[in-house]
Swiss-Prot record:
This is Ribosomal RNA small subunit methyltransferase A. It is found in: Cytoplasm. Disulfide bonds: none annotated. It comes from Bradyrhizobium diazoefficiens (strain JCM 10833 / BCRC 13528 / IAM 13628 / NBRC 14792 / USDA 110). Its EC number is 2.1.1.182. It catalyses: adenosine(1518)/adenosine(1519) in 16S rRNA + 4 S-adenosyl-L-methionine = N(6)-dimethyladenosine(1518)/N(6)-dimethyladenosine(1519) in 16S rRNA + 4 S-adenosyl-L-homocysteine + 4 H(+).
Amino acid sequence: MSAIDDLPPLREVIRQHALSARKSLGQNFLLDLNLTARIARAAAPLDNSTIVEIGPGPGGLTRALLALGARRVVAIEHDERAIPALQDISARYPGRLEIVHGDAMTFDPRPLLNGESAKIVANLPYNIATQLLINWLTTEPWPPWYDMMVLMFQREVGERIVAREDEEAYGRLGVLANWRCETKILFDIAPSAFVPPPKVTSSVVRLVPRAEPLPCDRKMLEQVAAAAFGQRRKMLRQSLKSLGVDPARLAQAAGVDATRRAETIPISGFVAMARELADIRSEG
């Protein structure tokens, strides 16, 4: 019996269902139910919440979410070997766990939500974690279909998500994430907590969507950030040339010094340049 419910410990679940982690699926199983409960509590309040979980594996986080009061969990699992273990959890929490055997990169959970808002809570497979986050950050319309994300990443990715100007990890991901969300690293988890242990420390990050991000066209913002950080050590007057407009004109119209580098520009500066880029291109 585990610490949070009357289901078997996760090591026993893995043994029963022969769930060896597959590197090809980016799997690292978190077996400490105290840690999975800590992740679940980070998404509080859970009462009456619908949770979308990606890559539940043997179900440690799934169990924590349900035990701590989530009304409904939609668990999207690509690995068919994990489905029987999740079905055992569903039997323990009847009517509260919906198991989807599918690929989170292509599966859209919104039709299952019946118009209700949800929270995304997941120990994401490392090999698709960043792209999944970008998919969620670029969803339209905004505000999005979720009202919170509590996600685990490699520490280096977590630092990029929360980074702001003049920080070493600041880049395209930080611009997009902090433009649309309030972000925070909540805590780290050591490699020893996982089976198999990854080579790096993991971080749990919370992202809360902003109801009204600074107004600009998202695609223009992504283009400006991609150009600027594509040559991050060069001044904007050089790095922005790839946009096909006069970089000096663009920066000046946005109130940004074209002799500065991308890593020193706040999100408001990127937003201003994105708006000016849209105006310049609309002029033909």
